Design a protein with these regions (language model features):
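Conserved alpha/beta cores of soluble small-molecule-handling proteins
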Residues: 1-124
Length: 124
């Protein structure tokens, strides 16, 4: 989170995080598949591009560049020893100010990865 790798059970946000109260966040839902040559993130570049476009539309400048987000995604998968997983990059207005005007709240970035079978269940 915000450039640091945080153990799953230690990841947290402040209770007054702006996004929790006003929904000021954007995210992507991405799959990583196990292949013969190792884990493969489905359309990583396209998902990162869409995340940045969504952030721009919401006036949330991402404090990292696109390549840093792509590489952080790959490193997060590797550090968690996953070969097939779900990826949730999230850009959100963090703790620091409350109220309807969000532009003074800092922009935070998190990338979560976890094992997840078939999206619609094993038969779907």
């Amino acid at each position: 989170m915000n450039g640091e790798f945080v153990p799953w059970d230690e990841a947290q946000v402040h209770v007054l995080t702006h996004a929790l109260h006003y929904g000021t966040s954007v995210f992507e839902g991405v799959r990583c598949y196990d292949t013969e040559i190792g884990p493969a993130v489905f359309r990583n570049q396209d998902h990162v591009e869409r995340l940045f476009k969504s952030s721009e539309l919401y006036y949330m400048p991402v404090p990292y560049d696109r390549e840093q987000i792509r590489q952080a995604t790959l490193e997060t998968i590797a550090r968690n020893n996953l070969r097939s997983c779900y990826i949730r990059p999230l850009v959100f207005r963090g703790y620091g100010t409350m109220g309807l005007f969000p532009l003074e709240a800092r922009v935070d970035v998190a990338i979560a990865v976890w094992e997840w079978g078939a999206y619609l269940g094993e038969e779907g």
